[in-house]
């Protein structure tokens, strides 16, 4: 068969069916045309020689999306988990619209669903919209099977004939997961009546194809009063097949005896399940599972009776790790208290249980007799044949609660009468202790004020970075430096230059330099004041910490330790600010020399140091013979002290190094 690849691409380009698969093509080099050429006989693609008419909207068609194809090395593809795919109406592109005059007599090949739509004069575009909704619903999902497509095409609901009179409806949704083992879940919701399920015929399923049979078996066990019931059969991979019966009863106690089921779970109620084959049982209290196994039947009856019917009206203690919601726990406790107090079980005609614990089975007659004996021994007033109304049960319960409150009130009165009276001597001792405490408070009131001030100043003091790393700069506080820029101009004899091109820049720089020095001086005062306050607080608080007298605390403010401590901190701060201001002065001096070189070349000459400057530099060099070449901070301090620029200091030490080398060689 000859296939026009271009027409096939046009038809398939908008198909959303492939978008529902999340797989990727293994061979990326395999072309789309090769796939359709080798799979042309696939029932999804059955094009005739006549291609579909072009779409009415001349818009660029999107590229085909990736789909889940299992390919071999020869690009032979096959759909995964679909040995026999149904004829899908999704062959029509959902991205294109066709003329409305299409009819069933057209020469174009359609799927059965398309032909049905055309015979009924239905609009294909509306049908395609439904397909898009369906595909979007199952997009990015791996739980897709042919059953969904069959249900979608047939568009039918599974109605149960036995429940048509009650206007009940059922939905049958099968979800298959690739595994041979399954889990069957039956949800029975009964909101008004007692539900007594004796499921002796629920067998475990071994194949994935038994889901519909399980639905029929479960529907026959449903009561006619259940108007809205949904059966959901979900097959989940598991090595052990088991049947799980979930019963929700919101108003009454639900007791179920399943001879073949291994586990019985009852949400929101107390459920007791007996397994006659293995003598094992499971007591499930709402969402808290208490599993007890391998216990004789007689012990089980006794423990069950003691758990539900307690003489002291004590409710079951639920596990704290899995707390129930408040509504369920309160309703369960109240129900159990009423059943303990009244012990009334009605007959089958009144839609209640025929026996106190289990159904009336021949195999359990002797066991149920043991239950009667146990309950009668614990409470002689218990009569299994007695049936009280709900109003009588409430009255009895209220009477019991009133009796309990009266007993508690009497016990409290007895306890109050037996309390020992406090002697008068003890009251006198308490008053004396209170007076002593008040005296101590008044005595140390001043100390408390000092402590509060100390803490407040510590908080303020911590906001200032007063103590930077200035170990190497601690020695710079002792230098007496004149930071006025006029001293540098006079020492360099720059004041004699009268050119306006030189004076204006110098005046401009001098203004900004002076303002910067004023700001630094103000910052020094701001940072020094907290140090004074902090040291003062230390001098006041130190006697309190050492438990010294108040008289010595006044004299300790001027102690040598406090004054030395204050001076050391202030010297550290002073050293830092001297270095900063020295950088400002030497850098400004370098700028002045650059201005002199540009605007007053005739006044530029070799700057010779004065005798005072030369003497100071030699003294510093001799004092640091072991390390005669200073760091950058030391250079700017020497330049600020001797009114030299940074470049002049560098040149002097460079020349000094060369002289030392020449002197050593001559020696």
Curated annotation (Swiss-Prot):
- What CDD domains does the entry give? homeodomain
The Basic residues compositionally biased stretches are: 334-343
Low complexity biased stretches: 97-108, 344-379
Under the heading Pfam families, the entry gives: Homeobox_KN
Keywords, alphabetical: Coiled coil, Developmental protein, DNA-binding, Homeobox, Nucleus, Transcription, Transcription regulation
Q: Which PROSITE patterns match?
A: HOMEOBOX_2 (PS50071)
What is the originating organism of this protein? Answer: Dictyostelium discoideum (Social amoeba)
Biological process (GO), any one = regulation of transcription by RNA polymerase II
Indicate, by first and last residue, each region the UniProt record lists as having compositional bias (Polar residues): 75-96, 380-390
Record's protein name: Homeobox protein 3
Provide the disulphide bond pattern: none
- DNA-binding region (UniProt annotation): 602-664
The task this protein performs is described as:
Putative transcription factor.
The segment annotated Disordered runs over 44-108, 179-232, 249-268, 331-418
Instruction: Tell me the InterPro entries matching this sequence.
Output: HD (IPR001356), Homeodomain-like_sf (IPR009057), KN_HD (IPR008422)
Q: Give GO terms: molecular function aspect only.
A: DNA-binding transcription factor activity, RNA polymerase II-specific; RNA polymerase II cis-regulatory region sequence-specific DNA binding
Q: Where is the composition biased (Pro residues)?
A: 52-63
Q: Which GO cellular component terms are attached?
A: nucleus
What gene name is listed for this protein? hbx3
Q: Where in the cell is it found?
A: Nucleus
Where does the record place a coiled coil? 386-454
The stated induction of this gene product is:
Up-regulated by phagocytic stimuli.
